[in-house]
Amino acid sequence: MKMASTIIAMMLSVAVHGQTREQVLTEIKRHGIPHPHIVLAQARLETGNFTSRRCRRDHNLFGIKHNGKYARYSHWKESVTDYKQCISNRYKGGDYYAFLRRIGYASDPNYIGKVKHIVKTTNL
C-alpha cells in the first residue's frame, strides 16, 4: 500500500519546472505518439510528476539513455521528440503495455504495474 500512497501523493503535486501535464500531453499528441495517456503516465512516473532533478536539470521526461548515460536536452520538448524516435520503428500496434515490457523499457519489474496505476488513478 505504501507504493500506492507514494504514487498518489506524487500525482497530487503540481509541476512547476517548465511544463505541466497538460502541456506534455499536448506535445505527445502533436507528435502523434500512440497511446498518449500511457506515455504521459510514463513521464509522470519517470520524473516524480515533473519534479526530479533529471527532469528539472536535464529536461529528460522519460528516463531515456544514450550510450548508457541519461540523455540531456535543452528543452523538455526535445525529450518528447526523442521518445518518439526511440519507439517509432519498434511499435507496430497492439497492447502498448506489452510492447513496453517486450522492449525492456524499464529495469523495474513493477514498471508496467506502476504506469497502469497512474493511468487508472489519475483518470488519464
Predicted regions, residues:
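Catalytic cores of secreted/periplasmic lytic hydrolases that degrade extracellular macromolecules
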Residues: 2-6, 11-124
